Amino acid sequence: MRRTRSAVATGPREQRRSGATGGLSGGESRAQRSRSRTRAGAGGGGGAVGPQPSAKPRPKPPPRAQEAAAEEPPPAVTPAASVSALDLGEQRERWETFQKRQRLSFEGAAKLLLDTFEYQGLVKHTGGCHCGAVRFEVWASADLHIFDCNCSICKKKQNRHFIVPASRFKLLKGAESITTYTFNTHKAQHTFCKRCGVQSFYTPRSNPGGFGIAPHCLDEGTVRSVVTEEFNGSDWERAMKEHKTIKNMSKE
């Protein structure tokens, strides 16, 4: 009999606990709704709250993702993309075939085309100093016109050179290996390799907008002939006045 009473007595107690728990949950729900209404009314200054948009704002990416996106370089422009930007018309297939056959990038193919037609009648010479620290290329005729100057410094260093516009000269390597000597008017820039002392090119006083290239510093195979003209640099002003073409040799 005691066991039966105990079992019967247990039932109502459990129900009371369950009811108490349910009442607490209901109280919490009402409190949450009350707080929600309070927050909704706070931003409206006590007025009626209008309908809220249903679309949710997009979540912002985490800071690490933003940093990675900022640091990521733009996609490289491929030769095909560069070609598609040009209106090649019916020549597109020929152009792409030419690039593949010559194994050239879009820039390389354009450079070859420009060099061929812009420097018609010229050849590309290459050269440099003795130790190889300084290397350059220059577009000039295969038949070189050399000036042999007898001014004080040219006489001592045997400065025989041909003159080209600056746009036809390109230093391939060795900018950090070059040192410069100037004197008098300081217009002539006598550039030498710091290591071996060879002057393979310089900026002449007669043509400060161009370069004087030493023909004996060119690589073999591109020079067809050489004509040497003596220039009386020891009497500079008179020589420059009497010579009709030297001052224009660095012009395009």
Swiss-Prot record:
Biased composition (Pro residues): 54-64
Record GO terms (molecular function): carbon-sulfur lyase activity; metal ion binding
Transmembrane segments: none
Primary location: nucleus
Family per record: Belongs to the Gfa family.
Protein role: Required for distribution of pericentromeric heterochromatin in interphase nuclei and for centromere formation and organization, chromosome alignment and cytokinesis.
Protein known as: Centromere protein V
Origin organism lineage: Eukaryota, Metazoa, Chordata, Craniata, Vertebrata
